[in-house]
Amino acid sequence: SMADINEMVELYLEDGYSYDGLVEALEYTFTHDEAVEAVDNCGADWNEQAVLAAQNTLEYTAYSYDGLYYMLMEYQYFTDEQARYGVDNCGADWNEQAVAAALQQLEFSSTSHDKLIEELVEYGEFTREQAEYGVENCGADWSEQAVKAAQESLEYSAYSRDGMVEELVEYYMFTDEQAQYAADNCGADWDEQALRYVTETLEYSPDSYDGLYQAMIDYYGYTAEQAQYAVDNCGADWNEQALKAAQETLEYTPCSYSDLYTNLTEYDGFTEEQAQYAVDNCGADWNEQALLAAQDYMEYLDDLTRDTLLTMLEFDGFTDEQAEYAVDQLGL
């Protein structure tokens, strides 16, 4: 009935609705025509509704001027003029909104002084002055924020102490002093972090004892002692790691027995015994590997003769018989 729809209109207008937003809300219960008629005759001042909507919105979440304007336009369907009137007249102190936004951000994510300013400017659409005011006045202990950020990072990935400091400085924008404090107070056992790094690495990529050890020191900031502890205690079967490495190599490039052995020892850091185990057990058909290598050469080099291709395959470590098989299959 009209009485029912008018009563519902009055209830909605207490919260602040735009014309289009109110029509949409009423259409869940009434027909479109009934909703339009009720809204056309409700006598609402849509500018004041925008003010009310802005005030109600600010009661449960902090917004910048531009952020609130966008919210009123895009999600509550006020016109440009109504949304502008709403934010201009809602009585908000945008500096204090920046403080509230900073506090809200810190409730669910740890961050640094400088990064929080950037987030308030970029995502919250506060002016830089408002963002700086908000961050300066939010009461955060930035050293403790660094500790929390370190602990959050450790939930998802293994880190060395130096790697953690670098992450906190480079990504989170903490000062070096704050990052050092966090690394010392986040509760990490760096030996166990090293072990975790090795274990996680070997889950998706085979590696040798020496390769892992050196990479941990050269690229990931672990000490020699931590790296040694990790590779000694990770439980890896290095023969099987060599075998996996050999099989992965053969998936993307053809190799001869001798070339594969050389790759495993000279480039991947496996021992001679581990490399020998791998090439003996990788299941490769060396004739077919020679054929694949020959086909690669034929694809990229024109006018190859039989003798030239034989020479190239033998240079790659294939036996005379394997090279002969390959060129015979190609009809040369």
Residue positions per predicted region:
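An alpha-helical, amphipathic repeat domain used for nucleic-acid recognition
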Residues: 1-332
